[in-house]
UniProtKB/Swiss-Prot annotation:
Protein name per the record: 5-methylthioribulose-1-phosphate/5-deoxyribulose-1-phosphate aldolase
Pfam families tied to this protein: Aldolase_II
Cofactor comment text: Binds 1 cobalt ion per subunit. Can also use Ni(2+).
Catalytic activity: 5-(methylsulfanyl)-D-ribulose 1-phosphate = 2-(methylsulfanyl)acetaldehyde + dihydroxyacetone phosphate; 5-deoxy-D-ribulose 1-phosphate = dihydroxyacetone phosphate + acetaldehyde
Native organism: Rhodospirillum rubrum (strain ATCC 11170 / ATH 1.1.1 / DSM 467 / LMG 4362 / NCIMB 8255 / S1)
Active site per UniProt: E75
Length: 221
């Protein structure tokens, strides 16, 4: 099979199922990719994670071309473009996680209400402007929101999280969703106080060596 790399295919399937188990995606929503040589492997369009088999995973080359029995996820463009533009990124996770999506639909970026926002690479988690799913325009908006960041929200859509590995990208997606829920709950009472920029700079510096051996959270019982 073109672009085989069977271990990466199995790893991507396991990751897609884990994202569903963690409640970050439901049904056929969301998609994941991992860097593979001169291209990427990505989950296909229209299949639930539980039904995925290695041959369903799609290889896309550096030119954005693919072949095989399955079409890639409709969001393959921003996966391809993020991996092409960001050598620090080895995997991309896109979810429609509930609280992240609520904030994205409200046009609410996540500010530095909590120091853990720095896990996403800066002093906020931005929102990429809305564009129709699967378009080059959406990819451009995602890249802009991801500049200097490891994660972002997508207006009226969902969330993107990245990492050097699938494990790291999923861990960050879990963290972003947790922050989104905490921020939403704060907003039910009042606007939370925002940490100053100099404090977030200190946190960002400390995070350069934080969590290297952190374990992925277990799924809820």
């Amino acid at each position: 099979m073109p672009g085989s790399r069977i271990a990466l295919r199995h790893g991507l399937i396991d990751a897609a199922r884990q994202v569903t188990t963690l409640g970050l995606n439901k049904g056929t929503a969301g998609n994941l990719s991992v860097r593979a040589g001169d291209g990427l492997l990505i989950t296909p369009s229209g299949l639930q994670a539980a039904d995925l088999r290695p041959n369903d995973i799609v290889f896309i080359d550096s030119e954005g071309e693919w072949r095989g029995p399955r079409k890639p996820s409709s969001e393959w463009r921003f996966h391809h473009d993020i991996l092409a533009e960001r050598p620090d990124v080895g995997a991309v996770v896109h979810t429609h996680a509930p609280f992240s999506t609520v904030l994205a639909c409200l046009g609410r970026p996540i500010p530095a209400f909590h120091y853990m926002v720095a896990m996403a690479g800066g002093n906020d988690i931005r929102i990429g402007a809305y564009a129709t799913f699967g378009t080059a325009e959406l990819s451009r908006h995602a890249l802009a929101a991801m500049e200097g960041r490891k994660a972002c929200l997508l207006a009226h859509h969902g969330m993107i999280a990245t990492g050097r590995t699938l494990k790291a990208a999923i861990k960050l997606a879990v963290e972003v969703e947790e922050l989104a829920e905490q921020y939403w709950r704060c907003l039910q009472i009042a606007e939370p106080e925002i940490l100053p920029a100099d404090e977030m700079e200190r946190v960002l510096e400390k995070f350069k060596t934080y969590g290297d051996n952190a374990q992925l959270p277990s799924p809820p019982a």
